[in-house]
């Protein structure tokens, strides 16, 4: 073999290796983004137009009480954010005619760390629930927002005796780093028993005004072993460049809930976009989701849950939850069973996402009736009420067990709509189940 042939063969091998490595790198970034915080609740707090966020108001966000009376832990992460002080000053663009200054930033800090409210109240609420239902197998994570340093602002104030001019990038970064340091210092001083500071949130929902700031701030945040997250609105400028912008995770906003004119197809498109761009997903609803609300958007919330299940978002994606000012609290207080029904459904999905299994000593009891699946030759047992089935990793849920034509035992975990999500399961386990009708 001559020298040219050897060279050509080596070049081809190198190219194939490069392509293989590049394809592998792409495959790693395919699919929904995952995160140590599985379910992140957005808490709008600080402005005078918000509720105080006392321990009682946090209760339905910390634990959920199901229809059968049992409680379980709900959200494992909480994002505290605010756009305006409610008195005329804004912490982000487009929310107020007047930009917040250092004075308002300090006021917002005081509100966040106020005793008996916000972080303090959340910590106490968790402590109270630990006494009632036991310690969770996770630590509640906290994400804190960073106000947007608005370009051109010159009246913000001083850092280390130097006036800040936000027409200069170095001053924008310096002021934000000061705020990060204040958040870190106060959180440490508070000595919360049940909260851990996970990272920070970029308040701007696009990069129209501050695109050059996220990378240097990301480096500073990472130097303290904290994470940096972002939730851009639907197809916001820069949403598809979130990694290049320095964020550890970005959540896709479908922005479907808010307008009845937006078709449900948006939810499918948002899920597919997130999976393509390796983003997490945000589930959105507000007080209009209550069944008895005027011009209720209840069905739009149901559509989110339906589509997120079908698109496997609940199964594999990190999730953020926008619930308006306090829609979860409103659902909790509602006297309409439909509101509790949809929250039971959502809470059951959240609990199951943690992969938590109940260790129960009681014997499995199943109420069932014999039915017939629409596939010819396949017998079916429809399990109408599974009380306890810790041996197969299910708890308090309903599902069907199918014996297919080729004697394969299958579980259907989808009882909420006409679609079916099938999983193979252990024949040995299922044959140990005793049905109350004697089968």
What spans do the regions from the language model cover?
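Extracellular glycoside hydrolase catalytic/binding regions
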Residues: 179, 203, 213, 218, ...
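Aromatic-lined carbohydrate-recognition surfaces of secreted/lumenal glycan-active proteins
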Residues: 140-150, 163-179, 197-205, 221-239
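Substrate-binding cleft of secreted/luminal carbohydrate-active enzymes
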Residues: 235, 249-263, 267-357
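N-terminal catalytic cores of secreted or lumenal carbohydrate-active enzymes
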Residues: 26-174
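Hydrophobic faces of well-ordered beta-strands that scaffold small-molecule active sites
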Residues: 78-79, 142-144, 198-202, 228-231, ...
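Active-site groove signature of glycoside hydrolases
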Residues: 79-86, 143-150, 186-208
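Phosphate-group recognition and catalysis centered on beta-loop-alpha active-site segments
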Residues: 26-28, 351-439
